[in-house]
């Protein structure tokens, strides 16, 4: 008997999604997978008024939570930051009684406007990507979630169509069975 793939909630946050070729290409395979729920935060909450109980219910229903977004000022777009602050509340995701996400999996999928070489101590951004993403790793730990190695698409705008298609295939393969041995 084959086990079902883990249910994945893909939280997509891009304020200018229509202009992001890379993110649109990455999302395409996700929309074709029955175990993946793609949840576009900017489409659902253009006014930033987040339905916290609805979002928390979505989190409870999924085992793997993917945060897909561009890197904005060494962080995430504003709506995702608001979502993190409001939805991952004390008593739900952390603190006394806050164990609703314990044991689930967190993976960040990030697009950047600069090459990987820009993320070094001696380079333009002065820090490696692992340091830049540390707040997200800490948030996962606060929620008692397993932190999965991030997927980073560097210099997303400058990737060829073939390179983006290759990234999308690999991403889609992972989403189809995210907790398979070697899949994390």
UniProtKB/Swiss-Prot annotation:
Per the record, the domain of life is Bacteria
Q: Name one GO molecular function term.
A: FMN binding
Q: Which Pfam families match?
A: Flavodoxin_2
Its keywords, alphabetically, are:
Cell inner membrane, Cell membrane, Membrane, NAD, Oxidoreductase
**A single GO cellular-component term on record:** plasma membrane
Which coarse location class describes where this protein primarily resides? membrane
List the EC numbers from the record: 1.6.5.2
Keyword NAD carried by entry: yes
**Protein name, per record:** Glutathione-regulated potassium-efflux system ancillary protein KefG
The gene behind this protein is kefG
């Amino acid at each position: 008997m084959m086990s079902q793939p883990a249910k994945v909630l893909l939280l997509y946050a891009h304020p200018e999604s229509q202009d992001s070729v890379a993110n649109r290409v990455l999302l395409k395979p996700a929309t074709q997978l029955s175990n993946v729920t793609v949840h576009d935060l900017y489409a659902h909450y253009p006014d930033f008024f987040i339905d916290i109980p609805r979002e928390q219910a979505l989190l409870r229903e999924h085992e793997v939570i993917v945060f897909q977004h561009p890197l904005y000022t060494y962080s995430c777009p504003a709506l995702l930051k608001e979502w993190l602050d409001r939805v991952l509340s004390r008593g739900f995701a952390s603190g006394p009684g806050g164990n609703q996400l314990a044991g689930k999996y967190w993976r960040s999928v990030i697009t950047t406007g600069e090459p990987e070489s820009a993320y070094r101590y001696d380079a333009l951004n002065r820090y490696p990507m692992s340091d830049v993403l540390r707040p997200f790793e800490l948030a996962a730990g606060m929620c008692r979630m397993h932190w999965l190695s991030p997927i980073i698409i560097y210099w997303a705008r400058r990737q060829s169509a073939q390179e983006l298609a290759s990234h999308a295939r690999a991403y889609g393969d992972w989403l189809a069975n995210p907790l398979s041995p070697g899949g994390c």
